[in-house]
UniProtKB/Swiss-Prot annotation:
Function description: ATP-dependent RNA helicase involved nonsense-mediated mRNA decay and ribosome biogenesis through rRNA processing.
Protein name (Swiss-Prot/TrEMBL): DEAD-box ATP-dependent RNA helicase 40
GO biological process: nuclear-transcribed mRNA catabolic process, nonsense-mediated decay; rRNA processing
Enzyme class: hydrolase
Organism name: Arabidopsis thaliana (Mouse-ear cress)
Length: 1088
């Protein structure tokens, strides 16, 4: 007992200092949690708070259990043999184990659950048997003291025989009680067990002693057990309501827990959870011949699983260790949450510090249901639910074991992870993903860098590609923007460099190709950031910067080279780089590089790399071009897809707003959005052209401090702009698609598509600049009816990302744009003619302004047919897509040979006819033109016409308007002051365009007939022409008389002649001077 008193204070009861005045066999106990002193009789297992005055009287009557029917007489013989055991031994096994259930400390359930039966049994046996006082204090795994007893072999054998007999169904109460006591001796840590058995344990011994607590039970036992027996649930003494699969090895018969016993225990666990008392009865072998099959499987050894002798015979495993194993196993198994909850409930419900005799029976067993439900209770009493508790339906107490539906396949954690993150793989022997950084086995220094960067776990693309890449296998990874692809290949590169140990001065070991300078420098920054601890060197090669510094860095040596294909190919041709050490090749944004036309350079570079390399290809889309180059460059690759590959998907973390905005309202709406953002929020505005970027920078930048980046900026300017934007000094970045891919800047809140891009893929990449690395973002897109052909794909992207689709966009998609989509005429490549509108109308007549759809002169974005203003120019040019007054190459319109009809930067004439169609343009100045479609060849072009914006004068703003064209000076079509057409002899495009764009502008000059003049020169234009036109065999010269006195009918006739004339002029450059003179004279007469 001294050993027990020296035990540290814990939540469980402990012996009080020995008091010689206490009558025997009473002992003083102290509740470890409350410190309350109470008294316990080991023989009767009675506890009370009043100090006992005399030993309690012993009942001389034996329990009358003859009324309990027994299934066989053979078991009774074994029970009679068990009667010969000393009663002291029975008490020794059950004395102190039963007492904790009556203490106030019994309400502290965790200590009871964690305390092994072997801890408490010696405490009682130490009082009664001197040979068992050799106890060893063993620190319990859960922090509670545990007592390990080493018993003599004789007593172990005796206990073993008792256990063997206690397995069999009992006829007599003392046998029943002995079996119960002995079994409970190994489950003292189960509190509810104690609550029940404290009243039933001293039911009787070999001498037929019966104590008051047993008398309480006898009044109920015959009726209850009889009822249960007739139901096939004979439970005269019951195994604990515990699935055997949840027991520790110490509770098994041979302690080894072999496969057969595990299977049997699993069946028993299922039966106990689903069948309740029937399963318990089966375990106790108290069955009729037709009882549970589980009893037949377990045989007579089931109760012996708790045999103390068998437990201690396995000296290499201590009892407390076995109990710890069980507890851990119990808590770790599924389906035990209901038991845990019940274990938490029991102490609370039994926490009243009442005298055991004064406590109601239902309170003493803690209400009944948890007693039976708790699998850790050990033996729960004679009845399944406790001797003093009402009968409960078992399903209300124990949660049935979870059984998956046969329809649903069992998924492993890896499959669940892949399904949750939409990870699909194609290949053989694909390893499981690294769900956490710790499971990846990465070097500590790399893990520190990743954790310090704030990454909680690998992204799906990283988790799946890392283990594959570390196997030196080729990979094709397809994932959307912002998915963490950069670290997906950098981390394997770091691991490779740790093993290779190559001399970087002989050439790089890792080569990474990227499409743009911005992405290349960004990859370099990430490599230096996460490879700092690994002492990795990295250099970046890109165009737009001097080669000298880059070559010097290569000479110093670099483990990793990040390059754009163009600059790397240049350096390779200079033979300033050696690829013989390259072991890892990475193609980042491979689809973008192919779109930019880098495939020849890529193939040339790859041919210089040894074939033993490992190749990783990361792409956002999977078109056939990418598939082809992947099949050529990769060997047996593993394909890893994040999301669906067959459709373009946007990041669902981005809220997308698509607004149908007229061109003239875009700038005003842009300013509204910028003003609505929080101060300091980073915004990217994407435009389709450099010119528009500069224009917006001038108009918007004054108020919002915007910076611009596009292809015309030098590398120094680009770096400065990006640094300004990253640092927050400039919160608005205006960019072309050069920044649509690979640009990774934190805290970008808003992306605005001022122009819709040339494809939905670019749209997805544009908006992907926000919502990166798990953040959220907002994207605004200005959509016009001219973008109608992208509407169906845009709707798919919006619906795929669960975004709202505006009704206007649906209408545009249904009608094909422009108010009658099928009416759009197309050019030779199937593209929509820019100046044709559907439904037979013309683009020049279709909208506000001077016929323009969005104001201006029917340009896509205002101006005179221009996309962004100007006279037909896409951005502020006179018909030019890129130049100010013309096409990309500063020409007017998109005429026959791609728009060099009326070239020159400052011309007063322009191609108002546009790409084609019979477009009309008119204002009340002097314009009337009719385009005759695209025409054929240079002479006729894509819409002919000329615009003279001056009232009554044929003066061109530039005297050398058409000097780049025809150099022949045989005649002058017009005596304009500028002489702009004096050198055009061929009449190819100059004349044809002039014919196409003039039919209206003479109406404002006194209501005369329509004049087809191109100029309103104050002097007669053709009177000085004495030279007759050259006559050829195929020229048809129109009669001069029909056009001299021109009226409306004659004008119509002339229009019918013009196509033939034009086609002829295209062939030989004939000039119909008479027709031109007739066209000019009515205008000349009007001059003052």
């Amino acid at each position: 007992m001294a050993t027990t008193e020296d035990t540290p204070a814990s939540a469980g009861p402990r012996y009080a200092p020995e008091d010689p005045t206490l009558p025997q066999p009473w002992k003083g106990l102290i509740d470890g949690s409350t410190g309350i002193l109470y008294y316990w009789n080991p023989e009767t297992n009675v506890t009370q708070y009043e100090r006992p005055s005399a030993p309690p009287p012993h009942s001389a009557t034996t329990p009358k259990l003859a009324q309990i029917p027994v299934p066989s007489s053979g078991q009774g013989h074994q029970a009679q043999h068990e009667q010969a055991k000393p009663v002291g031994h029975v008490s020794q096994q059950h004395g102190f184990q039963q007492q904790p259930q009556q203490f106030p400390s019994q309400h502290v359930r965790p200590q009871m659950m964690q305390q092994h039966p072997a801890q408490q049994m010696p405490q009682q046996s130490g009082q009664q048997f001197p040979q068992q006082q050799s106890q060893s204090m063993v620190p319990h795994p859960h922090g509670h003291p545990s007592v390990q007893t080493y018993q003599p072999t004789t007593q172990q054998q005796q206990q073993g025989m008792q256990n063997q007999h206690s397995q069999m169904p009992q006829q007599l109460s003392h046998q029943y009680a002995h079996s119960q006591q002995h079994y409970m001796g190994f489950r003292p840590h189960m509190q509810t067990q104690g609550l029940q058995n404290s009243h039933q344990t001293p039911q009787g011994g070999p001498h037929g002693q019966q104590f008051p607590s047993q008398q309480e039970y006898n009044s109920l036992a015959p009726k209850r057990e009889g009822d249960e027996f007739h139901g096939g649930k004979k439970t005269g003494f019951s195994q604990p309501h515990l699935p055997n699969s949840e027991r520790s090895p110490s509770q098994n018969t041979h302690f080894e827990a072999n496969a057969a016993s595990q299977k049997t225990n699993a069946n028993l666990a299922m039966a106990q959870k689903c069948n309740g008392p029937q399963a318990n009865a089966a375990v106790t072998q108290f069955q009729q011949p037709g009882a549970n099959l589980i009893h037949q499987q377990l045989g007579p050894r089931a109760p012996n699983q708790m045999d103390q002798t068998m437990l201690h015979q396995k000296s290499h495993v201590s009892p407390f260790q076995s109990n710890n194993t069980y507890e851990n196993n119990l808590q770790s198994r599924p389906g035990n949450d209901s038991y845990v909850n019940m274990r938490m409930e029991v102490p609370v419900r039994g926490a009243q510090p009442l005298h055991p005799a004064a406590m109601p029976k239902d309170i003493r067993i803690s209400g009944g249901p948890p007693t039976n439900a708790d699998p850790a209770m050990g033996q729960t009493g004679h009845g399944t639910y406790g001797h003093a508790g009402p009968a409960f339906p078992n399903k209300s107490l124990v949660r049935p074991h979870f059984v998956t539906s046969p329809d649903v396949p069992h998924l492993s954690p890896v499959e669940i992870y892949r399904k949750q993150h939409e990870v699909t793989t194609t290949g053989e022997n694909i390893p499981a993903p690294y769900i956490t950084f710790e499971s990846s086995g990465l070097p500590p220094e790399i893990l520190r860098e990743l954790l310090s960067a704030g990454f909680p776990s690998p992204t799906p693309i990283q988790a799946q590609t890392w283990p594959i890449a570390l196997q030196s296998r080729d990979i094709v990874a397809i994932a959307k923007t912002g998915s963490g692809k950069t670290l997906g290949y950098l981390i394997p590169a770091f691991i490779l460099l740790r093993h290779c140990r190559n001399d970087s001065r002989n050439g790089p070991t890792v080569l990474i190709l990227a499409p743009t300078r911005e992405l290349a420098t960004q990859i370099q920054d990430e490599a230096l950031r996460f490879g700092r601890s690994s002492r990795i060197s990295c250099t970046c090669l890109y165009g737009g910067a001097p080669k000298g510094p880059q070559l010097k860095e290569l000479e110093r040596g670099a483990d990793i080279v990040v390059a754009t294909p163009g600059r790397l190919n240049d350096i390779l041709e200079m033979k300033m780089i050696d690829f013989q050490q390259v072991s890892l090749l990475v193609l980042d944004e491979a689809d973008r590089m192919l779109d930019m036309g880098f495939e020849p350079q890529i193939r040339k570079i790859v041919n210089e790399i040894p074939p033993r390399r490992q190749t990783l290809m990361y792409t956002a889309t999977w078109p056939k071009e990418v598939r082809k180059i992947a099949s050529d460059l990769l060997v047996n690759p593993v394909q890893v897809n994040i999301g669906r590959v067959d459709e373009l998907a946007a990041n669902k973390a981005i809220t997308q707003y698509v607004e149908v905005v007229p061109q003239m309202e875009k700038e005003r709406r842009l300013e509204q959005i910028l003003r609505s953002q929080e101060r300091g929020s980073k915004v990217i505005i994407f435009c389709s052209t450099k010119r528009l970027c500069d224009h917006l920078a001038r108009s918007v930048g004054r108020h919002f401090g915007a910076v611009v980046i596009h292809g015309d900026k030098t590398q120094g300017e680009r770096d400065w702009v990006l640094n300004q934007f990253r640092s927050g000094k400039s919160c608005v970045l205006i960019a072309t698609d050069v920044a649509a891919r690979g640009l990774d800047i934190k805290d970008i809140r808003v992306v605005i598509n001022y122009d819709f891009p040339t494809g939905v893929e670019d749209y997805v990449h544009r908006i992907g600049r926000t919502g990166r690395a798990g953040a959220t973002g907002v994207a605004f897109t200005f959509f016009t009816e001219q973008d109608w052909k992208y509407a169906p794909d845009l709707i798919k992207v919006l619906e795929g990302a669960n975004q709202q689709v505006p009704p206007q966009v649906r209408d545009i998609a249904m009608r094909g744009g422009g108010g009658g989509g099928p009416g759009y005429s197309q050019d030779r490549r199937g593209m929509v003619n820019r100046f044709d509108s559907g439904g037979g109308g013309t683009r020049w007549d279709s909208g506000g302004g001077f016929g323009g759809r969005g104001g201006g002169f029917s340009g896509r974005e205002g101006g005179f047919g221009g996309r962004e203003g100007g006279f037909g120019g896409r951005e502020g040019g006179f018909g030019g897509r890129g130049g100010r007054f013309g096409m990309r190459d500063d020409s007017f319109g998109r005429g026959g040979n791609r728009g060099r009809g009326f070239t020159g930067p400052d011309a007063g004439h322009m191609n108002v006819g546009g790409r084609g169609g019979f477009g009309r343009f008119g204002n009340n100045n002097n314009m009337e033109s009719r385009g005759f479609g695209r025409g054929s060849g240079r002479g006729f072009g894509r819409g002919v016409g000329r615009f003279d914006n001056r009232r009554g004068r044929s003066r061109s703003r530039s005297p050398d308007l058409v000097r780049p064209r025809r150099r022949s000076s045989s005649y002058s079509r017009s005596r304009s002051r500028s002489g702009s057409y004096s050198r055009s002899r061929s009449r190819s495009r100059s004349w044809s365009r002039s014919r196409s764009r003039s039919p209206r502008h003479s109406r404002d000059r006194g209501g005369h007939n329509r004049s087809r003049s191109y100029s309103r020169s104050p002097s007669p234009v053709y009177e000085r022409r004495d030279r007759a036109p050259r006559v050829s065999g195929f020229d048809i010269k129109p009669p001069v008389e029909s056009v001299v006195n021109l009226d409306m009918n004659a004008a119509a006739a002339i229009e019918n002649v013009v196509p033939t004339s034009l086609s002829e002029r295209q062939g030989n450059g004939v000039v119909e001077s008479e027709v031109e003179a007739a066209l000019v004279r009515p205008v000349v007469d009007e001059e003052p």
